[in-house]
Amino acid sequence: MTEFTTLLQQGNAWFFIPSAILLGALHGLEPGHSKTMMAAFIIAIKGTIKQAVMLGLAATISHTAVVWLIAFGGMVISKRFTAQSAEPWLQLISAVIIIGTAFWMFWRTWRGERNWLENMHEYDYEHHHHDHEDHHDHGHHHHHEHGEYQDAHARAHANDIKRRFDGREVTNWQILLFGLTGGLIPCPAAITVLLICIQLKALTLGATLVVSFSIGLALTLVTVGVGAAISVQQVAKRWSGFNTLAKRAPYFSSLLIGLVGVYMGVHGFMGIMR
């Protein structure tokens, strides 16, 4: 496969770099551990913008380290498949796994949204019934905030963070440690980067893809952390489409991953048919 320098000279490398950056940015927007944990942590400790940037960069560094290990491991393993006859089959297998990952991400997001909506409907009914009883018995209402959609695991992490750190002073080392540990959680997008690196069989281009993915992830995580520090609620109030964009990000991410899988599958199939 052509090295990155040759691809750059031919003008063909532009497709890989923006796609990897977009994958990283969309992964950071998905409802999950990194974004939810960081926002909850910054809000709980009443963190500054500087602390939010530190937290986002620390999470990105650890996440990048995991992706580098996976990607380089994949490229080392791929050296065993140097025969041209094996490459189309490897492309086809990678395409199947990538498309399967995209479908899994789409289904997981759809199921999480559906469960969240069902729980909110049940909560609305119980809350309305409870308020009706309080109006007759006590003459007052209990008010609860309706939270934004997030998966159950992420919500549990956020609640635990609030209990542990609410109102406490934390050091910069604690912030860095929290960010480093929070970024170690693997993600489907990292698997996609791994499979792309295996398919490309190019060390330089594979490393560039990982760096590009990390840049996109860093942009999102740092932005989320800073947004939490300056109160993301204000942004949501001024722009009604903010929450909708965040909730729809996993769908865009799964679509992009699926397109990459289709692209690889078509090339693999054409290679087998030759």
Curated annotation (Swiss-Prot):
It comes from Shigella sonnei (strain Ss046). The keyword Ubl conjugation does not apply. This is Nickel/cobalt efflux system RcnA. Residues 130-149 are annotated as: Disordered. Residues 1-12, 78-86, 196-209, 273-274 are periplasmic. GO terms for cellular component: plasma membrane. Keywords: Cell inner membrane, Cell membrane, Cobalt, Cobalt transport, Ion transport, Membrane, Nickel, Nickel transport, Transmembrane, Transmembrane helix, Transport. Efflux system for nickel and cobalt. One of its GO terms (molecular function) is nickel cation transmembrane transporter activity. It holds the Pfam family NicO. It comes from the Bacteria. It is a multi-pass membrane protein. NCBIfam families: PRK10019.1. Induction: By nickel and cobalt. Transcriptionally repressed by RcnR. Residues 34-56, 108-174, 231-251 are cytoplasmic. Belongs to the NiCoT transporter (TC 2.A.52) family. RcnA subfamily.
